[in-house]
Structure formats: structure tokens, C-alpha cells
């Protein structure tokens, strides 16, 4: 896996792809500040992450690097409907090297609430909808 960088010229992350997305454990879990509760299973996690990524107008990784013996930390910024959003993601792997647990912490609050509502709208009709904010009335 190629990673490590600060986003600067010497450690550019412009071509970084989070390869852990292609290596999810069957019972992987995801939780975070834009969600209520925890979603479990590769299909659930993949569906949620695809929904989130389709809402990003841009995404710039500032840092990607190992944490402990089985973790990976990503720090990135993006835009959702013109609003800036930043995120720290901690990915913990199982002994087989598969992503086992994902925690995402978004900021600022106004942007994370917007993201949560938009993800909820995208996931309407799925069992994962309940984890995200309700749309505006």
C-alpha cells in the first residue's frame, strides 16, 4: 500500500486512492460523527461510503499514515454543495489485513449535518437510512 505524506510537494497525495475500500472484512463496521449508531457488513459500509463519496465536489488528502500496528489514519478536506468539510478517518484492520472498523470524524458541525442529511436522502429505501439525519421538512 502506498501512502504517507503531508500533502506538500515532497509527499503529494494527489494520486492517493484508499485501497482499503477494496478490502473490507465481511463483518466490517462503520461509525462516525455524521451517523447515529453503527452499521455493519461489507455491503452496508460500501453502500454508505459510495453515497458519501458521490456528494464530494472535491477531495484533498492532507495526510495518510499508519497508526499503531493495525491502523491507518486519513486526514482530508472536501466540499459538499460548496461548503467545506474536513474529516479524520481511522481504519483498523484485522489480522488478515482487511478493514475491520472505520471511524470518521467530520467538522465543522454545520457541514457534517448537511452531509448527514444528504447521505440520508441518498439512502432512502435502504436499511442504512436510519443512521443519518432526516431531510428538511
Locate each region found by the language model.
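C-terminal and inter-domain tail/linker signature
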Residues: 1-137
Amino acid at each position: 500500500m502506498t501512502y504517507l505524506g503531508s500533502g506538500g510537494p515532497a509527499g503529494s497525495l494527489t494520486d492517493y486512492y484508499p485501497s482499503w475500500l477494496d478490502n473490507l472484512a465481511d463483518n466490517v463496521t462503520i461509525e462516525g460523527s455524521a451517523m447515529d449508531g453503527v452499521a455493519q457488513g461489507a455491503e452496508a459500509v460500501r453502500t454508505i461510503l459510495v453515497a458519501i463519496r458521490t456528494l464530494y465536489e472535491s477531495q484533498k488528502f492532507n495526510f495518510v499514515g499508519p497508526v499503531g500496528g493495525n491502523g491507518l489514519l486519513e486526514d482530508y478536506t472536501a466540499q459538499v454543495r460548496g461548503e467545506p468539510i474536513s474529516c479524520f478517518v481511522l481504519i483498523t484492520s484485522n489480522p488478515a489485513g482487511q478493514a475491520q472498523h472505520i471511524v470518521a470524524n467530520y467538522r465543522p458541525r454545520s457541514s457534517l449535518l448537511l452531509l448527514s442529511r444528504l447521505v440520508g436522502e441518498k439512502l432512502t429505501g435502504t436499511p442504512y437510512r436510519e443512521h443519518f439525519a432526516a431531510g428538511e421538512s
